[in-house]
Swiss-Prot record:
Protein name: LexA repressor
Family affiliation: Belongs to the peptidase S24 family.
Record-annotated DNA-binding residue ranges: 29-49
Enzyme Commission number(s) of this protein: 3.4.21.88
Record key words, sorted: Autocatalytic cleavage, DNA damage, DNA repair, DNA replication, DNA-binding, Hydrolase, Repressor, SOS response, Transcription, Transcription regulation
Superkingdom field: Bacteria
UniProt lineage: Bacteria, Bacillati, Bacillota, Clostridia, Eubacteriales
NCBIfam families reported for this sequence: lexA (TIGR00498)
Species per Swiss-Prot/TrEMBL record: Clostridium kluyveri (strain ATCC 8527 / DSM 555 / NBRC 12016 / NCIMB 10680 / K1)
InterPro entries: LexA, LexA-like, LexA/Signal_pep-like_sf, LexA_DNA-bd_dom, LexA_repressor, Peptidase_S24_LexA, Peptidase_S24_S26A/B/C, WH-like_DNA-bd_sf
Gene Ontology MF terms in the entry: DNA binding; serine-type endopeptidase activity
Length: 202
């Protein structure tokens, strides 16, 4: 998330808070547009969605002027999880380790995990495990795995999400799709283990 994006979110949040304090009710989306210098109501809606996901506001999508500011005492402690590039759940692609954005999650969800990140799934090789194209996979950074773990593995600088099996003289990276064959390699680098999936419904 860019600094400019964060600043705009702060402007919108502060304006909503001040309007509720002054008038007793929240501003409309068009009033927010005018106050922060945005022309598009859809852009404001996207900022409101981010503020809601981060736990700063609450809305009722079926009604207008229903934005509610959530005070700090009501909020759960959140962590910003980096979304790093895109990996494949089909044919491997070049791993891109650049942070595209951040995704807020309650600290309760993370528990005692040391280092986590998210990667976007591409392809259908893990559908039988309930992992679909476009899902955000929540990954704990680890360098080893137990048989049966779903891992992010690097093979010659290409990343893939598969189920891990260390066998007699090779490693089997098994898709969860009966129509796709396993990847058999002598060795691979484990960069993470799947601990969760986030899916957004339209």
């Amino acid at each position: 998330m860019t600094e400019r994006s964060n600043n705009r979110q702060s402007q919108i949040y502060n304006f909503i808070k001040s309007q509720i304090k002054q008038k007793g009710y929240p501003p409309s989306v068009r009033e927010i547009c005018t106050a922060v210098g945005l022309k598009s109501t859809s852009t404001v809606h996207s900022y409101l969605e981010k503020l809601e996901r981060r736990g700063f506001i609450k809305r009722d999508a079926t009604k207008s002027r229903t934005i509610e500011v959530i005070e700090k005492s009501q909020k759960k402690e959140m962590i910003e999880v980096p979304i790093i590039g895109t990996i494949t759940a089909g044919m491997p692609i070049i791993a891109v380790e650049n942070i595209e954005d951040y995704f807020p999650l309650p600290m309760d969800y993370i528990k005692n995990k040391r280092e986590i990140f998210m990667l976007r799934v591409k392809g259908e090789s893990m559908v039988d495990a309930g992992i679909l194209d476009g899902d955000l996979s929540l990954i704990e950074k680890v360098h080893s795995a137990e048989n049966g773990d779903i891992v992010v593995a690097l093979i010659e600088n290409e990343a893939t999400l598969k189920r891990f099996f260390k066998e007699e003289n090779h490693i089997r990276l098994q898709p969860e799709n009966k129509n796709m064959p396993p990847i058999i390699v002598d060795d691979c680098k484990i960069i993470g283990r799947l601990i969760g999936i986030y899916r957004q419904y339209e």
